Amino acid sequence: MADHATSSSPAVQAQLDRLSALSPGADVLGLERIGALLARLGDPHLALPPVFHVAGTNGKGSTCAFLRAAMEAAGLSVHVYSSPHLVRFNERIRVAGRLIDDDMLAALLAEVLDVADGIAPSFFEVTTAAAFLAFARTPAAATIVEVGLGGRLDATNIIADPVVTGIAALGIDHQAFLGRSAVTIAGEKAGIAKRGVSLVTMDYPRPLRERIAAVAAAAGAPVLSRGRDWTSETRRSTVRYEDAGFSVVTRRPKLVGAHQSRNLALAIAMLRHQGALRIPEAALRAAADWAKWPARMQRLSPGPLANILPDGSELWLDGAHNPSAATPVARALRSMRRGRSVVLVTGMLANKDARGVLRFLASSVDRVIAVPVGGHDHHAPAVLADLARAEDLAATTADSVGAALATVDQPSVCLVAGSLYLAGEVLAANGETPV
């Protein structure tokens, strides 16, 4: 599936046009092209500040956000590489705490693309190379790298010597690339394991644990799993993390949802099982309040979209696009209802399990309004509406999120979900571009 990117900077847009002409088909996973590309650029991946590498089906981005928050609370400067972007391409590359500026971004993309002849790199491989160039040339205390897709054959896995690796929640997604079983997918995620480097994981069903353990053992990586090597407990207002000889109690994260407490604990566990940085307890506690991660159960502020709704309504946004991600969203919606109707405005890419997502959300939603996802192959809104009706939900279609919200005629909790690309449209339309 081709990616899409635009910029208000002519210099950046010229390079994004070159970048968007690249076609990341199903055959591009692998480390050969990214290795060849980085070699032509002087191997910047070998000169990165200490790397924290995070994989997972859901929650890896939030885990990276908590890692960054803890490090910055400790007074450290941090690079972050994540994907996809929501509104601006610059969101993918955070250099020493700040989103990459347009001049640097344009220059780096041009530098990478200019040496790519004969390699045929993908969109993501070029972006990864540009990020690594930026990080290698700019001082910082650490580098946080979110896996793009899978792990074993993801371009970010060219990094051979991270200081710690982690795997967040697992589920079924990207089957065309990673396989159709949760066990196979778990093995792909565990492919980021490196010899002698701690692989910190959540707790998973036994078959997934066994596959991860086997992959890690083959790589020579020790596995430290939740429930065995470290634990976390979420209460009404606090999260308690504990491992051998250490415990810390934080407030529950400001990021909404019980799953975010687990993501916070995973980040703490990763920080506890690496030796490159010293992060004081106060910084671990601060991470719960400091972390920000847009389009993950985010309540939108008053703006052009939010103001369409009747008084007493709330507009929420989440990028959930697979059944595993829909589960905590459904739980959060139930706690927000307070006697109001819950309306789901949704659009999903054509390769997503729309039926599964709607099935998990059905018990928490009263009405569904299906919309298109502009610029991407997506499930037709009429098809989504039919799937919602099959779950005994009232369902209609609309041409846009704004048109959908205009049909809400009573105070409601409205959630836009189903695609990070749709989430980006909503943030832009409501004037909330991530910074």
Question: PLM features: residue spans?
Answer:
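Nucleotide phosphate-binding/pyrophosphate-handling subdomain across enzymes
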Residues: 48-50, 142-145, 153-166, 170-173, ...
